[in-house]
């Protein structure tokens, strides 16, 4: 047993909570995760998910988090059991990208502009890139197993208040996602619902992601037999019930780009609540005798910064503790 081993409470079992808990448990600490939802029921499990094209604030920190995460995903992509693989595909826009290259794509070599013939009708700009794709249900299972194998404990119980958390442990990481709105009383965090349609993959190996600032766009991400189609964003919407009309719209938009998808068999329709905020909240607070590191507000980009945020959160939590 590590003599400097600490007891830590992590709130939330989405991709932020489980990644941070894994970093801490693998460093020899005693980590308990408390969650109101099984990892497979979190918003993270509904994500597409692709590393790279979306933007986050604060920009410089987010770029650093994304870079660290990219390195981890490249390693994980060598093992099929993780659910991570590298795929080639297109990031496109119907108008010019607000920043070029968008998101964290500027960190990569080998990203190149699409030729005229590569873009579907209606698109003005596009980049071809090879990016990590993450099959989130499989990945969340992998992360849970990895955390438990490192000696971690996963408990299904909702943390009702920061006082309750501080009473349980003097070291707390808050990865409550959109739940932070109530838990911390942070009105700046709001749900942005997003619907995905899962279809049987008719054989597509490339991804397509449209960057859009309106509430709907076109994307598809292949994960073996499963293809995740998107997408939508509805601000201030707490409803996790899939809408059949939204499904129709997603299928129609994706079919316009890949006609083979008009015939694809729908397996399931899923809705997640992205924890949107004007900026990621990753900082330390001293509260009722406990050190609480907040790590929430990642919007729709939580997966792409997950390992970077996890290492930074763990570092903040353990900084300057007496030896």
Residue ranges, per PLM feature:
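Short beta-strand to alpha-helix junction loop
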Residues: 58-68, 126-142, 241-245, 305
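A short coil-to-beta-strand element that immediately follows conserved catalytic motifs
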Residues: 84-87, 154, 259-271
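Flavin-dependent oxidoreductases
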Residues: 19, 166-252, 256-265
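Helical element adjacent to the flavin cofactor pocket in flavoenzyme catalytic cores
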Residues: 123, 127-169, 175
């Amino acid at each position: 047993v590590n003599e400097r081993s600490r007891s830590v409470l992590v709130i939330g079992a989405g991709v932020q909570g489980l990644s941070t808990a894994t970093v801490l448990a693998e460093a020899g600490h005693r980590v308990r995760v408390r969650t109101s939802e099984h990892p497979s029921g979190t918003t993270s499990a509904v994500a597409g998910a692709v590393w790279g094209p979306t933007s986050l604030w604060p920009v410089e920190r987010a770029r650093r988090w994304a870079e660290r995460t990219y390195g981890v995903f490249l390693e994980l992509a060598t093992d099929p059991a993780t659910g991570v693989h590298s795929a080639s595909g297109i990031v496109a826009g119907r108008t010019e990208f607000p920043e070029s290259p968008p998101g964290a794509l500027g960190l990569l070599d080998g990203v190149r502009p699409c030729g005229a013939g590569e873009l579907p009708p209606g698109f003005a700009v596009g980049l071809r890139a090879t990016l990590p794709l993450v099959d989130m249900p499989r990945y969340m299972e992998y992360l849970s197993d990895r955390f438990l194998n490192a000696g971690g404990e996963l408990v299904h119980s909702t943390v009702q208040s920061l006082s309750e958390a501080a009473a349980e442990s003097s070291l707390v990481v808050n990865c409550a996602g959109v739940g932070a709105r109530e838990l911390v009383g942070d009105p700046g965090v709001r749900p942005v619902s997003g619907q995905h349609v899962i279809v049987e993959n008719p054989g597509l190996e490339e991804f397509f992601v449209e960057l859009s600032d309106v509430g709907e766009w076109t994307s598809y991400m292949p994960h073996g037999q499963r293809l995740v189609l998107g997408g939508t964003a509805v601000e201030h919407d707490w409803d996790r019930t899939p809408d059949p009309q939204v499904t129709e719209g997603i299928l129609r938009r994706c079919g316009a780009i890949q006609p083979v998808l008009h015939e694809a068999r729908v397996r399931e329709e899923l809705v997640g609540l992205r924890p949107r905020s004007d900026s990621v909240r990753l900082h330390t607070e001293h509260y009722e005798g406990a050190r609480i590191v907040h790590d929430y507000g990642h919007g729709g980009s939580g997966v792409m910064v997950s390992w970077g945020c996890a290492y930074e959160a763990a570092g903040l939590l353990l900084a300057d503790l007496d030896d």
